[in-house]
Amino acid sequence: MVHSFVGRLLIASVLCGAVLAERSVAGGQDDWPQWRGPLGTGVAPRARPPLKWSENKNIRWKTELPGKGHSTPIIWGERIFLTTAIPYGPAVKPRLPSRPGAHDNLALTHHHEYVVLAVSRKTGKILWQQTMHKDLPHEAGHVTASLASASPVTDGERVFAFFGSRGLYCLDPNGKLLWKKNLGEMHTKHGHGEGSSPALHGETLIVNWDHEEESFLVALDKRTGKERWRVARPEDTSWATPIVVEHAGKPQVIVPGTKRLRGYDLASGAVVWECAGLSSNIVASPVAANGVVYAGSSYDTRALLAIRLDGAKGDITGTKQVIWSRERGAPYVPSPLLYGDSLYTLRHYQGVISRVDAKTGNDQGGPFRLDAIDNVYASPVGADGRIYVTSRDGITQVMSHGERIPRMLAVNRLDDHFSASAAIAGRELFLRGERYLYCIAEE
């Protein structure tokens, strides 16, 4: 059911004073410089990736990766950057998490090194591999998690790699360390691990640090790593990545949380607005376009909200700033995909995709069954009028976008397991599996 607070208000009717959500990282049309792509929405607007592939078709190259990581590869020019965690040394006595409610966790039996990789986009060759840190993790995370789940971000001159409790690192494109910063030790809910990626806007790098102790949001000078500001957050563990949007010429950092979804002034860290309504265990990252922010969660209760930024000040819970809210189709692990006027969401274990009118919150038909898809951690991506959904067991189902009833266009299988989200650039699709990095391109 959709709850409308402004009747038949259409976002398109917002006048020239409307907020425009701008991409945080300025890259070329063939780049994927951050976690959810050039627009931060999961869409590559000018890309034309392949429709069909298999282990024997349309694989330009396939590179075996060391260690394990669920970070999405990022692409700038002819280089791909990604992170991984590599176990080393003899096994130690297992150390199980001690967090309250811990379940389904990995036992800690090995030291790890935390590594940034650069890969040739043309050949798949690993160009360099730099170890940033080594330790025996204090928390290993959920059995399905990795110790390198935060995706890097780049402006083309610097690569920012975040390993949470193991540090934040800034490198040049050739792997030279420019600066590093230790933000402390994170203690996550149930010991399920860390996952929020940094966000970059202009000269400022943003890191959200929500955990079971003193949570905070911090802004850093991207050139030096020096803190510009740090603000406390009265929140428990979350795994979502912040986004940065422009409002009336001023960028805001949008961060979801169990207690409040908040917009912070990028310049000062001051809270501009906040809104209640999400659930606990915030994993999905928000998306934004045309002056509206969309955020959702569905761990214990389900909620999907659309927030109009024009006029948003203070506590906007239950006000006309909440254009619409709904319970059906709320995301959990995969983040929403915002493609044109359609907002796509997935529940990670159901094999069902919902399509919502971004203007009204009403269903655009569906939800639609993805017959080939079961469990999904990767967020869906869109390009060339298609939606790509990749399951954990290596199946990518492709469906059409922009049609009243979407067509299921292809089912593609690879011999790997996938939790990282896809990256799209030009005519190529990049899939990062548990063992391999694939470049998928028409032969």
Question: Where are the regions a protein language model picked out?
Answer:
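Bacterial N-terminal signal peptides that target proteins for export
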Residues: 1-13
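Hydrophobic h-region of N-terminal signal peptides that target proteins for export
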Residues: 12-23
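Noncatalytic, solvent-exposed loop/strand surfaces
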Residues: 22-443
